[in-house]
Amino acid sequence: NIDPKKLMPHVKNTIERGKKVMASDYAKALAQLSEYRFKVDQIFSKFDYIISPTVAIPPHKCNERPNIIDGKIDISEISDHEMFNENNYDYSSWIFVLAQFTAPFNWSGNPAVSLPCGFTKSGLPIGLQLAGKKRSELSLFQASKAFEEIKPWHQNRPNI
């Protein structure tokens, strides 16, 4: 048993939202997930890897949602979608913004790895994601190793 008073607000919010999911909606989501996985498999029939940033924005302080990106862009300017409205903000929506490059492979079941590939102007690490075909973990590790041999960012550490 978990004491609800010890949970962070975003965890409580996620639990409450989960309680409202109907079985029929869950079944529909599973069917959509199956279709999605099929489409991702089709993409990987043409490509060995997909390369992307690991996350969509530079790192920010733990437990804080950045309002400004790189000192210039107000987060509200990214989209007028209601999930970005400050009054309607919830943690799961913000996590989706952060995980927009990683979530697709979490859903599809494809292996992916995040590799260090540089630092922000303020010295925080930036990640590059390399995703592969299902059951291609060995090939993905080999490609990751080759990248790290060419660009040994993994040997650098941010100043703390």
Predicted regions and their residues:
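Short, basic, helix/turn surface patches
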Residues: 1-6, 79-84, 135-149
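A short acidic, glycine-rich active-site loop
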Residues: 72-99
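Short helix-loop capping/hinge segments that flank enzyme active sites or metal/cofactor-binding pockets
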Residues: 1-41, 57, 62-66, 72, ...
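Short, hinge-like loop/turn segments at secondary-structure boundaries
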Residues: 68-70, 131-132
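Structural helix-boundary/capping segments
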Residues: 27, 38, 92-97, 101, ...
